[in-house]
Amino acid sequence: MKRKSVYTCLVMLLMSLALQAKDKDVAVAEALLKRLLPSYIESFQFQKLKGEKDCFTIESVKDKIVIGGNNANSMAMGLNHYLKYYCLTTVSWYADIAVEIPEELPMVGEKVVSEARVDTRFFLNYCTYGYTMPWWQWKEWER
């Protein structure tokens, strides 16, 4: 009987830890934010959205910018959208150039919802592989 209660407690502990475990996509988005805007990490929150189609949402909840996405790439798109249209800034390809944003982050009025229009998309022009990318280091790729 005692052994059964120990096993029950162990299973309950493991289940509660599993529920508290951070989603991998959320962790990846947070790592991106930490690289780009380390002093603003507490001002943002990322949430995993359900669904297969790529999408992101952006909203202000209390004093935080909440970005949702169905995967890490969608969350990164949401962060880029917020930086571009609310902070009026861009993220340079050059890893040594800091992202400049207002000291006080602009709040999002109405919730932003964006969904991919097509299933398959591509990134970059194939010619760029011969112009700059062969000389990139990991910090450029990671950015």
Go through the PLM ranges and name each one:
Residues 11-20:
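Hydrophobic h-region of N-terminal signal peptides that target proteins for export
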